């Protein structure tokens, strides 16, 4: 009860300019649920309370991982991957890299949804039908976005080191390698908002 009251009060203080920055700690998503708080986590609440397009961006010394979908059950992820969502999330990551990390021409990699990016439709059609054409449109307009890349080999081959940020299609696809590679030194930065 006190965790959520503290979080709500701190968010209010941030909105009112009483504090400059909000730093949060992990909270138990089950314990915070109530009639007045029905959000799966910090990012979702901050998205409602602050201006901008909130995005979970995991940050460590040499790795940044954003998510196209965050607290979405795995069996619903494919239905959430629309051209509009992909464009919005990539733009949010790009602007955060420019504004918050001083990277003028960021290179962004996007991971595929299905094993082996669908193997030409044999293991799912979302990578060919949605991700590839959307990424091409974004790239053709000048954003250095690449992919989709097969997620199973992307991190193990150190391919991630060539990019300023990686965007995973779903929560565990991005957070498992991030937490493994950051060795407990990473943080969840809520990008895309008018406040830090």
What are these regions (language model features)?
Residues 1-126, 131-196:
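Anion-binding alpha/beta catalytic cores of soluble intermediary-metabolism enzymes, centered on
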